[in-house]
Amino acid sequence: MPVAQHRLASFVTRQWQRRGWFARMLWPLSLLFGAVSGLRRRLFRWGWLRSVRLPVPVVVVGNVTVGGAGKTPAVIALASALADAGLRPGIVSRGYGAQLKHPRPVREHSRAEDVGDEPLLIARATDLPVWVYPDRVLCAQTLLASHPGCNVIVCDDGLQHYRLRRDIEIVVFDLRMGGNGFLLPAGPLREPMTRRRDATLINDPNYRATHDRPDIYGMRLDLQDAYNLADPALRRPLSQFARLSGDQLLAAAGIGNPERFFASLRAAGLQPATLPLPDHYDFADNPFADAGAETILITEKDAVKCGHLDDPRIWVVPTTPVVDAALVEQVCRRVRALADRSTSQAGAQ
Protein backbone atom coordinates (compact mmCIF):
# COMPACT_ATOMS: atom_id res chain seq x y z
CA MET A 1 0.00 0.00 0.00
CA PRO A 2 2.75 2.58 0.81
CA VAL A 3 4.33 2.02 -2.61
CA ALA A 4 0.98 2.39 -4.39
CA GLN A 5 0.18 5.56 -2.44
CA HIS A 6 3.56 7.04 -3.27
CA ARG A 7 3.20 6.22 -6.96
CA LEU A 8 -0.17 7.96 -7.07
CA ALA A 9 1.20 10.97 -5.18
CA SER A 10 4.23 11.10 -7.48
CA PHE A 11 2.00 11.01 -10.56
CA VAL A 12 -0.13 13.88 -9.29
CA THR A 13 2.94 15.88 -8.28
CA ARG A 14 4.46 15.47 -11.75
CA GLN A 15 1.22 16.57 -13.39
CA TRP A 16 1.11 19.64 -11.15
CA GLN A 17 4.39 20.83 -12.67
CA ARG A 18 2.93 21.12 -16.17
CA ARG A 19 -0.22 22.34 -17.86
CA GLY A 20 -1.04 19.07 -19.58
CA TRP A 21 -4.22 17.04 -20.00
CA PHE A 22 -4.50 16.36 -16.27
CA ALA A 23 -4.42 20.04 -15.33
CA ARG A 24 -6.74 21.07 -18.15
CA MET A 25 -9.28 18.41 -17.17
CA LEU A 26 -9.40 19.62 -13.56
CA TRP A 27 -9.10 23.35 -14.27
CA PRO A 28 -12.88 24.02 -13.98
CA LEU A 29 -12.77 22.60 -10.45
CA SER A 30 -9.84 24.90 -9.69
CA LEU A 31 -11.98 27.87 -10.71
CA LEU A 32 -14.63 26.74 -8.24
CA PHE A 33 -12.04 26.19 -5.51
CA GLY A 34 -10.57 29.64 -6.14
CA ALA A 35 -13.98 31.31 -6.01
CA VAL A 36 -14.92 29.67 -2.70
CA SER A 37 -11.55 30.23 -1.01
CA GLY A 38 -11.35 33.79 -2.35
CA LEU A 39 -14.79 34.60 -0.98
CA ARG A 40 -13.77 33.25 2.42
CA ARG A 41 -10.66 35.47 2.46
CA ARG A 42 -12.75 38.51 1.57
CA LEU A 43 -15.31 37.78 4.29
CA PHE A 44 -12.53 37.91 6.87
CA ARG A 45 -11.04 41.02 5.27
CA TRP A 46 -14.41 42.80 5.26
CA GLY A 47 -15.10 41.81 8.85
CA TRP A 48 -18.11 39.62 8.08
CA LEU A 49 -16.23 36.69 9.58
CA ARG A 50 -14.58 37.44 12.91
CA SER A 51 -10.85 37.19 13.44
CA VAL A 52 -9.08 37.28 16.79
CA ARG A 53 -6.01 39.30 17.73
CA LEU A 54 -3.80 37.88 20.46
CA PRO A 55 -2.11 40.09 23.07
CA VAL A 56 1.31 39.16 21.63
CA PRO A 57 2.76 39.28 18.08
CA VAL A 58 1.98 36.35 15.79
CA VAL A 59 4.35 35.00 13.12
CA VAL A 60 2.82 32.49 10.69
CA VAL A 61 5.14 30.19 8.74
CA GLY A 62 3.40 28.09 6.11
CA ASN A 63 2.86 26.94 2.56
CA VAL A 64 0.54 27.97 -0.23
CA THR A 65 1.38 24.70 -1.98
CA VAL A 66 0.51 21.10 -1.18
CA GLY A 67 3.45 18.88 -0.28
CA GLY A 68 6.62 19.30 1.70
CA ALA A 69 8.56 22.48 1.02
CA GLY A 70 10.53 22.73 4.27
CA LYS A 71 8.06 24.47 6.56
CA THR A 72 8.97 22.49 9.68
CA PRO A 73 12.72 23.25 9.59
CA ALA A 74 11.87 26.89 8.86
CA VAL A 75 9.71 27.01 12.00
CA ILE A 76 12.52 25.43 14.01
CA ALA A 77 15.10 27.89 12.70
CA LEU A 78 13.00 31.03 13.16
CA ALA A 79 11.63 30.10 16.60
CA SER A 80 15.15 29.25 17.78
CA ALA A 81 16.43 32.57 16.41
CA LEU A 82 13.73 34.48 18.29
CA ALA A 83 14.69 32.69 21.50
CA ASP A 84 18.39 33.40 20.90
CA ALA A 85 17.48 37.09 20.46
CA GLY A 86 16.05 37.16 23.99
CA LEU A 87 12.38 36.78 23.08
CA ARG A 88 10.18 34.06 24.57
CA PRO A 89 8.37 32.29 21.73
CA GLY A 90 5.64 29.69 21.95
CA ILE A 91 4.69 27.51 18.99
CA VAL A 92 1.23 26.34 17.95
CA SER A 93 0.46 23.67 15.37
CA ARG A 94 -2.49 21.70 14.11
CA GLY A 95 -1.18 18.31 15.23
CA TYR A 96 -1.79 16.51 11.94
CA GLY A 97 -3.12 12.98 12.43
CA ALA A 98 -3.70 13.32 16.18
CA GLN A 99 -7.19 12.89 17.63
CA LEU A 100 -7.45 16.02 19.76
CA LYS A 101 -10.47 17.05 21.82
CA HIS A 102 -8.77 20.10 23.34
CA PRO A 103 -5.44 21.96 23.10
CA ARG A 104 -2.59 19.77 24.24
CA PRO A 105 1.05 20.46 25.13
CA VAL A 106 3.81 18.55 23.38
CA ARG A 107 6.24 16.99 25.84
CA GLU A 108 9.67 15.44 25.33
CA HIS A 109 8.19 11.95 25.65
CA SER A 110 4.88 12.59 23.86
CA ARG A 111 3.87 10.11 21.18
CA ALA A 112 3.58 11.20 17.57
CA GLU A 113 0.15 9.58 17.26
CA ASP A 114 -1.07 11.77 20.14
CA VAL A 115 0.35 15.15 19.06
CA GLY A 116 1.55 14.78 15.46
CA ASP A 117 5.01 14.02 14.10
CA GLU A 118 6.02 17.56 13.11
CA PRO A 119 5.06 19.23 16.44
CA LEU A 120 6.97 16.52 18.31
CA LEU A 121 10.04 17.12 16.14
CA ILE A 122 9.74 20.88 16.69
CA ALA A 123 9.41 20.49 20.46
CA ARG A 124 12.47 18.25 20.69
CA ALA A 125 14.54 20.47 18.40
CA THR A 126 13.74 23.79 20.09
CA ASP A 127 12.94 22.98 23.74
CA LEU A 128 10.24 25.66 23.51
CA PRO A 129 6.55 25.46 24.50
CA VAL A 130 4.63 23.70 21.71
CA TRP A 131 0.86 23.18 21.81
CA VAL A 132 -1.36 21.48 19.25
CA TYR A 133 -5.01 21.83 18.23
CA PRO A 134 -6.75 22.52 14.89
CA ASP A 135 -8.27 25.76 16.24
CA ARG A 136 -5.11 27.89 16.27
CA VAL A 137 -6.80 30.71 18.20
CA LEU A 138 -7.87 28.50 21.11
CA CYS A 139 -4.55 26.68 20.95
CA ALA A 140 -2.56 29.92 21.21
CA GLN A 141 -4.79 31.30 23.96
CA THR A 142 -4.29 28.12 25.99
CA LEU A 143 -0.53 28.24 25.45
CA LEU A 144 -0.38 31.86 26.62
CA ALA A 145 -2.45 31.03 29.71
CA SER A 146 -0.07 28.17 30.55
CA HIS A 147 3.09 30.15 29.72
CA PRO A 148 2.41 33.78 30.76
CA GLY A 149 6.01 34.76 30.00
CA CYS A 150 5.60 33.98 26.31
CA ASN A 151 5.73 37.18 24.26
CA VAL A 152 5.45 35.92 20.66
CA ILE A 153 3.52 33.11 18.98
CA VAL A 154 4.99 31.23 16.03
CA CYS A 155 2.26 29.43 14.11
CA ASP A 156 3.40 26.28 12.33
CA ASP A 157 1.34 26.37 9.13
CA GLY A 158 -2.05 28.06 9.36
CA LEU A 159 -1.68 30.60 6.54
CA GLN A 160 -5.27 29.79 5.61
CA HIS A 161 -6.48 29.92 9.24
CA TYR A 162 -7.66 33.52 8.87
CA ARG A 163 -9.47 33.57 12.22
CA LEU A 164 -6.06 34.07 13.80
CA ARG A 165 -4.78 37.56 13.05
CA ARG A 166 -1.11 37.67 12.25
CA ASP A 167 1.59 40.32 12.17
CA ILE A 168 4.15 38.56 9.96
CA GLU A 169 3.54 35.96 7.25
CA ILE A 170 6.38 33.89 5.80
CA VAL A 171 5.60 31.59 2.88
CA VAL A 172 7.94 28.64 2.29
CA PHE A 173 8.65 27.11 -1.13
CA ASP A 174 11.12 24.68 -2.58
CA LEU A 175 12.48 25.05 -6.11
CA ARG A 176 9.20 23.76 -7.55
CA MET A 177 7.64 27.05 -6.39
CA GLY A 178 3.99 27.12 -7.52
CA GLY A 179 4.28 24.36 -10.10
CA ASN A 180 1.95 24.99 -13.03
CA GLY A 181 0.41 27.98 -11.26
CA PHE A 182 -3.05 26.44 -10.94
CA LEU A 183 -5.08 26.16 -7.76
CA LEU A 184 -6.20 22.78 -6.43
CA PRO A 185 -6.99 20.28 -7.82
CA ALA A 186 -5.49 21.16 -11.22
CA GLY A 187 -2.32 22.43 -9.55
CA PRO A 188 -0.57 22.44 -6.17
CA LEU A 189 -1.68 25.88 -4.98
CA ARG A 190 -4.00 26.40 -2.02
CA GLU A 191 -3.94 30.14 -2.73
CA PRO A 192 -2.69 32.23 -5.65
CA MET A 193 1.03 32.92 -5.88
CA THR A 194 0.16 36.61 -5.67
CA ARG A 195 -1.24 36.36 -2.12
CA ARG A 196 0.08 38.93 0.32
CA ARG A 197 3.08 37.92 2.42
CA ASP A 198 5.92 39.61 4.24
CA ALA A 199 8.66 37.30 2.99
CA THR A 200 9.21 34.34 0.69
CA LEU A 201 11.59 31.65 1.95
CA ILE A 202 12.96 29.21 -0.62
CA ASN A 203 14.34 25.93 0.65
CA ASP A 204 17.41 25.86 -1.57
CA PRO A 205 20.84 27.44 -1.05
CA ASN A 206 21.11 28.34 -4.75
CA TYR A 207 17.85 30.28 -4.93
CA ARG A 208 19.60 33.48 -6.04
CA ALA A 209 20.37 31.87 -9.39
CA THR A 210 16.71 32.24 -10.38
CA HIS A 211 15.25 34.73 -7.87
CA ASP A 212 16.70 38.17 -7.17
CA ARG A 213 13.80 40.02 -5.51
CA PRO A 214 14.75 41.64 -2.17
CA ASP A 215 11.84 40.00 -0.29
CA ILE A 216 12.97 36.48 -1.24
CA TYR A 217 15.30 34.63 1.10
CA GLY A 218 16.95 31.23 1.14
CA MET A 219 17.30 28.32 3.52
CA ARG A 220 19.53 25.28 3.47
CA LEU A 221 19.45 22.05 5.46
CA ASP A 222 22.90 20.93 6.60
CA LEU A 223 23.20 17.18 7.18
CA GLN A 224 24.75 16.18 10.50
CA ASP A 225 26.35 12.96 11.75
CA ALA A 226 23.86 10.09 11.85
CA TYR A 227 22.87 8.46 15.13
CA ASN A 228 21.58 4.96 15.74
CA LEU A 229 17.86 4.79 16.49
CA ALA A 230 18.27 2.01 19.05
CA ASP A 231 21.35 3.61 20.66
CA PRO A 232 21.33 7.40 20.09
CA ALA A 233 24.72 7.77 21.78
CA LEU A 234 26.22 5.87 18.85
CA ARG A 235 27.06 8.35 16.08
CA ARG A 236 28.79 8.13 12.72
CA PRO A 237 29.73 10.70 10.10
CA LEU A 238 27.88 10.12 6.85
CA SER A 239 31.17 9.50 5.08
CA GLN A 240 31.38 6.13 6.85
CA PHE A 241 28.33 4.96 4.91
CA ALA A 242 29.86 5.84 1.54
CA ARG A 243 31.57 2.44 1.32
CA LEU A 244 28.18 0.68 1.20
CA SER A 245 26.72 -0.19 -2.18
CA GLY A 246 23.10 0.38 -3.12
CA ASP A 247 21.88 -3.04 -2.00
CA GLN A 248 23.61 -2.60 1.37
CA LEU A 249 22.40 0.94 2.05
CA LEU A 250 18.72 1.94 2.02
CA ALA A 251 17.34 5.46 2.48
CA ALA A 252 13.67 5.81 3.41
CA ALA A 253 11.55 8.92 3.93
CA GLY A 254 7.90 9.50 4.80
CA ILE A 255 7.93 13.24 4.19
CA GLY A 256 6.24 15.56 1.72
CA ASN A 257 9.14 15.43 -0.75
CA PRO A 258 11.20 12.26 -0.15
CA GLU A 259 13.41 12.94 -3.17
CA ARG A 260 14.87 16.00 -1.46
CA PHE A 261 16.20 13.78 1.34
CA PHE A 262 17.56 11.23 -1.13
CA ALA A 263 19.22 13.96 -3.21
CA SER A 264 20.91 15.43 -0.14
CA LEU A 265 22.39 12.01 0.69
CA ARG A 266 23.67 11.64 -2.87
CA ALA A 267 25.19 15.12 -2.63
CA ALA A 268 27.00 13.91 0.50
CA GLY A 269 28.61 11.11 -1.51
CA LEU A 270 26.22 8.25 -0.70
CA GLN A 271 24.52 6.01 -3.25
CA PRO A 272 21.61 4.40 -1.40
CA ALA A 273 18.68 2.44 -2.69
CA THR A 274 15.56 4.48 -1.91
CA LEU A 275 12.18 3.77 -0.35
CA PRO A 276 9.76 6.72 -0.59
CA LEU A 277 6.85 6.49 1.86
CA PRO A 278 3.66 8.57 2.13
CA ASP A 279 3.92 11.81 4.07
CA HIS A 280 3.18 11.29 7.79
CA TYR A 281 3.61 7.51 7.39
CA ASP A 282 2.79 6.03 10.80
CA PHE A 283 5.28 3.11 10.93
CA ALA A 284 2.71 0.93 12.69
CA ASP A 285 4.51 -1.95 11.00
CA ASN A 286 8.19 -2.13 10.14
CA PRO A 287 8.44 -1.35 6.40
CA PHE A 288 12.07 -2.52 6.51
CA ALA A 289 11.38 -6.01 7.87
CA ASP A 290 12.04 -7.66 4.51
CA ALA A 291 14.78 -5.26 3.40
CA GLY A 292 18.16 -6.89 2.96
CA ALA A 293 20.10 -3.67 3.53
CA GLU A 294 22.87 -3.60 6.10
CA THR A 295 22.10 0.02 7.00
CA ILE A 296 18.90 2.08 6.75
CA LEU A 297 18.92 5.88 6.84
CA ILE A 298 15.78 7.80 7.83
CA THR A 299 14.78 11.41 8.57
CA GLU A 300 14.27 12.97 11.99
CA LYS A 301 10.58 13.42 11.24
CA ASP A 302 10.24 9.68 10.71
CA ALA A 303 12.42 8.87 13.71
CA VAL A 304 9.88 10.29 16.19
CA LYS A 305 7.48 7.53 15.05
CA CYS A 306 9.99 4.66 14.90
CA GLY A 307 10.99 4.31 18.55
CA HIS A 308 9.11 1.01 18.84
CA LEU A 309 10.96 -0.60 15.93
CA ASP A 310 13.55 -3.01 17.26
CA ASP A 311 15.90 -2.69 14.31
CA PRO A 312 19.56 -1.79 14.98
CA ARG A 313 20.11 -1.19 11.25
CA ILE A 314 18.21 2.12 11.40
CA TRP A 315 20.22 5.33 11.55
CA VAL A 316 18.73 8.81 11.80
CA VAL A 317 20.16 11.67 9.73
CA PRO A 318 19.57 14.99 11.54
CA THR A 319 19.60 18.29 9.71
CA THR A 320 20.37 21.80 10.89
CA PRO A 321 18.22 24.44 9.12
CA VAL A 322 20.09 27.63 8.24
CA VAL A 323 17.96 30.62 7.20
CA ASP A 324 19.31 33.77 5.54
CA ALA A 325 20.65 36.06 8.27
CA ALA A 326 18.86 39.04 6.71
CA LEU A 327 15.45 37.42 7.20
CA VAL A 328 16.28 36.34 10.74
CA GLU A 329 17.37 39.89 11.60
CA GLN A 330 14.26 41.40 10.01
CA VAL A 331 11.86 39.06 11.83
CA CYS A 332 13.58 39.50 15.20
CA ARG A 333 13.59 43.29 14.84
CA ARG A 334 9.91 43.49 13.91
CA VAL A 335 8.80 41.03 16.58
CA ARG A 336 10.76 42.84 19.28
CA ALA A 337 9.16 46.16 18.31
CA LEU A 338 5.70 44.59 18.31
CA ALA A 339 6.32 42.83 21.61
CA ASP A 340 7.50 46.06 23.24
CA ARG A 341 4.41 47.83 21.95
CA SER A 342 2.13 45.08 23.29
CA THR A 343 3.82 45.29 26.69
CA SER A 344 3.42 49.08 26.77
CA GLN A 345 -0.26 48.87 25.84
CA ALA A 346 -0.89 46.21 28.47
CA GLY A 347 0.81 48.35 31.11
CA ALA A 348 -1.28 51.38 30.18
CA GLN A 349 -4.56 49.53 30.69
Swiss-Prot record:
Binding site for ATP: T65, V66, G67, G68, A69, G70, K71, T72
Catalytic activity: a lipid A disaccharide + ATP = a lipid IVA + ADP + H(+)
Entry's Gene Ontology molecular function annotations: ATP binding; tetraacyldisaccharide 4'-kinase activity
Enzyme Commission no: 2.7.1.130
Coiled-coil ranges from the UniProt annotation: none
Key words, A-Z: ATP-binding, Kinase, Lipid A biosynthesis, Lipid biosynthesis, Lipid metabolism, Nucleotide-binding, Transferase
Task performed by this protein: Transfers the gamma-phosphate of ATP to the 4'-position of a tetraacyldisaccharide 1-phosphate intermediate (termed DS-1-P) to form tetraacyldisaccharide 1,4'-bis-phosphate (lipid IVA).
Name of the protein in its database record: Tetraacyldisaccharide 4'-kinase
Organism: Ralstonia nicotianae (strain ATCC BAA-1114 / GMI1000)
